[in-house]
Amino acid sequence: ASGNYSTAMGWSTTASGHFSLATGKFAKASDFASTVIGHYNSSGSSVTDSASSFSTSNTAFVIGNGADVSNKSDAFKVMFNGDTTISNDLTVSGDIVISSDARLKSNIVTLGSTLPKLLQIDGKSYEMKGKQKIGVLAQEIEEVFPELVTKDDNEMLAVNYQGLVPVLINALKEQNVKMKEQETKYMEQEQRLERLERLVANMD
């Protein structure tokens, strides 16, 4: 442990960030006040390699699950700004509840037409980390709904799937309006046909 008031435990661990903690095997905690546990983590290393001051853009907590020095990776990561990354499936037995109170929001604008943009997106079936999955491609989403796509430090894109819900709601409402318009036109045509049939019958 080389950082001020830092602690390193386990095998070949490094705690170079001030007030940091590293425990496990080849775990490295170089961000200020960061905690790293596990094996060969890839996050938690600052540019200076020994952070001495706090920053919300730094890593707060990491669980490393890398195989070796050439294959470092993280199972779980929490940033000081609250951003959290889980590198595999998340199983939840209860509900996932997201804050959505209008009092927490500003510059609220009703979402306009989304159906044309939604039709530009294709659902995909693909393999990811050895598992068969169904979803969308972030690059396609970014072209029509860029606000739903984020990029990490490695330039990898991620999609806010929850943000697609209001998009789907508006698209469904648009489709419903079109169906009602078609239904009205059909009924009008039926009425015209009935009037024409009565007219022909009276002529006979």
Model-predicted regions and their roles:
Residues A1-S87:
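Periodic small-residue-enriched repeat registers in elongated scaffold domains
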